[in-house]
């Protein structure tokens, strides 16, 4: 529901031009909602099966979003920065596909790896490299834009910490 509320308020401001005084909860959800969503997704990974298969489907949906937004740009319906290069669906798809690889790790080891990935992600944030193919990891090239961007570092770490939470709570 928070995602719907955030997008509704954004759309009202963007398309209709309403100047809304944003409540504190909106700012909090806007800034931290993505991380909360990824953690909850990791938590849910511990409850289901066929994670790799579901990950392929989610990743394919992310690719479809990329294709549609790229088409909008190429047809002149939107600017280049509307293209989604590695959004939340790409991220969650990759995380789900990787879950079977580390599922059997002990919970403390998984927590340690998750923390390391989160810290590494924040340490490399904003790093500019020449290689254009490294953006899914969080290493950006000059001029990179994406309307939805969730790099693997730090978000794979947040997903792993979500699986730790899922194991602990459930």
Q: Positions of the model-derived regions?
A:
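Alpha-helical transmembrane segments and their immediate juxtamembrane cytosolic regions
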Residues: 1-170
């Amino acid at each position: 529901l928070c995602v719907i509320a955030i997008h509704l308020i954004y759309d009202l401001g963007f398309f209709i031009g309403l100047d809304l005084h944003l409540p504190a909860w909106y700012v909090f959800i806007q800034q931290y909602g993505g991380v909360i969503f990824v953690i909850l997704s990791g938590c849910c990974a511990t409850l289901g099966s066929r994670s790799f298969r579901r990950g392929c489907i989610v990743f394919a949906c992310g690719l479809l979003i990329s294709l549609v937004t790229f088409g909008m740009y190429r047809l002149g319906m939107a600017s280049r920065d509307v293209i989604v290069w590695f959004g939340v669906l790409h991220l969650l798809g990759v995380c789900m596909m990787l879950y079977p690889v580390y599922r059997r790790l002990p919970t403390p080891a998984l927590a340690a790896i998750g923390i390391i990935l989160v810290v590494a992600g924040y340490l490399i944030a904003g790093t500019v490299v020449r290689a254009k193919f490294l953006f899914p990891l969080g290493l950006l090239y000059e001029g990179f834009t994406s309307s939805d961007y969730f790099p693997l570092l730090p978000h794979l770490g947040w997903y792993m910490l979500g699986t730790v939470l899922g194991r602990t709570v459930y």
